[in-house]
Amino acid sequence: ILGPNGFEWLPFSDFIVSYPGILIAFIFASLPFSSKDFVLKTGGRRAGEIGTYSSIAVLWQWGLGTLFALAVLSFIWPELHPGFGTLLAAGFVGGHGTAAAIGSTFMDRGWDEAQSLAMISATVGILCSIVGGMLWIRWGSQKGVTNFITPFKDLPDELRTGLIPENKRESVGSETVSPLAIDPIIFHFAIIASAAVIGYYIGIWSSDLMSDYRIPTFSLAFLVAILLKWGLKTFRGYQYIDQKISLRLCGSFTDLLVVFGITSIQIPLLIKYAFPLFGLFIVGILICWALFFYLGPIVFRENWFEKSLYTWGWVTGIMAIAIALLRIVDAKNKANILSDFAVAYFAIGPLEVLLVTLAPVLIMNGYQWGFSIVTLGAGILLLLIILFLKMRMAAECNPQDPGKPHQITDIRSE
C-alpha cells in the first residue's frame, strides 16, 4: 500500500518486479540443503502426482477459459477479440510474466488492449490466490484435514502470536565453520547462491540453444543444488553444511519473496476494467475450486490438502503466494512439496511454454475453436487416465470392497 504502486511513500527500486523471480531461484537452491534426500521410489511418485494435477489445472484453464469466452461471452459482447478467453490462463496460471508475453504477442498482431487486460488478469489472480488460499486454510483447519496445523483456537500461543516463550525456543543452527574465517550464515548463503547463479547461467545457455524456450531458473537451481550436495557428500564436505541454517535461510528468502511479490502489484490496474472480465474470472475460480475440492483428494495419496493448497496458490496467482500459503500450513516443510514440485516442473514447464507459444498463433489464424477443444480434451483425457489408475489401484488394495468411496466424501458432506 505504501509502495510505488500505492501511495508512493516508499521509494522502491524500479526493478522490484524482478525480485520475486530472483528469490524463487534462491529458495529452490536451498531446498536440497534444508530437507531430506529425495528418494526416487517415493519422491518420483509424489512428483508425478503433483505434476499431473498441475497439468490438468493448466490445460483446463486454457481450454475452458477460451471455450467459455467463445461460446458465452462473445454472444453478450460480440466485439470481443477471439483470444479474450486466453487472458484467464495468461493471468492466473501464468502470472505477470506470462501475461506480458501473451499480451505483447497479441499486440504485435493488432490487439492493442491485450497487454493491459492480461496484466489485470494476473493482478486479480493474485488477489484470488491470497483470499481464496486463506479461506481454504480456515476451512481445512476447521474440518481437520490439515496435517501440520490445528484449528486456530487450539493452537499454542507461540503459533497464534508468533512470539516463542523462552522455555520453547530452539537453536537456529550450529557453527560448522569458524567465525574467524567466515561467518557460518554467510558460508551457507554462498553455497546456496552458487547453485542459484550457476542455474541462472545454464538457463541463459539453454535459451541460446532453444531460441523460443528457456528452462526455468528455479528448476535449474534446484538441480544444480542436488548435484552440489552430491559432490559435497562424495568428497566428505557435506558434514560442514547445517540443515537448520539452510532451512532458516530458505525461510528468509521466502519472507522477502512474499513482501516484494505483493509490493509489485499494480493497484490501478484492478479498477480499470470490470466486464466481461468478471465473468471470465468467475469461471477461472470455479475451475480451481473444483480441482481443489474434488480432484485433490483423489490424486494425492498423502498430504492432499497441503498439495492442493500449494497448487491453488500458483495456478491462480504466482509462485510467491503459493509458497506463502504453504508456509502457513507446512512451516517446517515436512511434506517436501517444494522439492516434488521442482522435479515435476520439468514436465509442466514445457507444457506451459508450448501453450503460450501456440495459443496466439493459432487464434490469430482462426483456429480458436480447435485450440480450445483440443486443450480441454487433453485435460479431460488426463483426468480420465488418473481416475482409471486410482480405481484400479483401489481395487487391488481393497479387493473385498473396490467401490468404497473416498474418505473425503464425509468431510465434504459435513
What are these regions (language model features)?
Residues 1-5, 13-45, 223-232, 248-271, ...:
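Hydrophobic transmembrane alpha-helices of secondary-active transporters
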Residues 6, 18, 71, 200-244:
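Flexible hinge motifs at transmembrane-helix junctions and intramembrane kinks/re-entrant loops
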Residues 13-28, 82-89, 212-224, 249, ...:
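Structural signature of hydrophobic alpha-helical transmembrane segments
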Residues 20, 37-70, 189, 248, ...:
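Entry/N-cap segments of selected transmembrane alpha helices
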Residues 34-48, 73-82, 104-116, 141-150, ...:
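Juxtamembrane helix-boundary/capping and inter-helix hinge elements in multi-pass membrane proteins
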Residues 68, 77-113, 117, 136, ...:
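Alpha-helical membrane segments and immediately flanking helix-loop junctions
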Residues 139-186, 233-239, 391-414:
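Intrinsically disordered, low-complexity non-transmembrane regions of multi-pass membrane transporters
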Residues 260, 267, 281-392:
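C-terminal transmembrane helix pair
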